[in-house]
A protein has these predicted regions:
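Nucleotide-activated sugar donor-binding and catalytic core shared by glycosyltransferases
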Residues: 1-201
């Protein structure tokens, strides 16, 4: 079940480009759509429902998650309409489609998905996270495609290939472990200079 975060004004474009209604009808996957901004929750639900999808929102699930919600299990698509739960969403997903990388928005932090063992499929626009995106791609933790249509097909191929999916998930975990401590290492390197400044040096 791929995860497809949808960002900003591109929500409608993404939903249409992915043919979510057709794919959901074929039970090929269940999209979990996570808008970046709360004010887009209702709009994204309306867009999905306009394509004939039955939508279940995270806020309606019990604390245990969708597995204990009949509504969620019967839905064609899930909508992540809560804040601070990306780890939950990535944990539920088989593959992450980074919505912000399919338009010139600069991409998203893919280390969070990788740390959850969720393979990443990203588009061409990752200039805000260029180094991380290039490293993840080189290490097999992320796959880059030209557009969202290709992204959905790449995600489906991974979902249908358990060995490739497991390999990508392990690569993501290893990539995240190597890169998670970057801030701490930077602060440690700067500490002598900060100490000198505080001492008036």
């Amino acid at each position: 079940m791929p995860l497809a975060p949808v960002l900003r004004a591109q929500a409608a474009t993404y939903l249409i480009a992915c043919n979510f209604a057709e794919l959901a009808a074929q039970r090929r996957f269940k999209p979990l759509i996570v808008p970046r901004h709360p004010q887009r929750f209702d709009e994204v639900q309306a867009l999905a429902e306009a394509q004939g999808l039955r939508v279940s929102r995270r806020s309606s699930w019990p604390a245990a998650g969708p597995v204990e919600s009949v509504e969620a299990l019967q839905a064609d698509a899930w909508l992540g309409d809560t804040l601070g739960e990306m780890a939950l969403y990535y944990g539920l997903a088989s593959v992450a489609l980074l919505g912000g990388s399919f338009a010139p928005l600069g991409g998203q932090n893919l280390i969070e998905a990788a740390a959850c063992g969720c393979p990443v499929v990203m588009g061409p626009h990752t200039f805000n996270f260029l180094e991380a995106a290039e490293l993840a791609e080189a290490e097999g933790a992320a796959l880059r495609v030209a557009d969202m249509g290709e992204g959905v097909q790449a995600a489906l191929r991974l979902v249908n290939d358990s060995a490739a999916l497991a390999k990508a998930a392990h690569a993501g975990l290893a990539f995240a472990a190597r890169n998670r401590g970057a801030t701490d290492r930077t602060l440690a390197a700067l500490k002598p200079y900060l100490d000198d400044l505080q001492a008036g040096g």
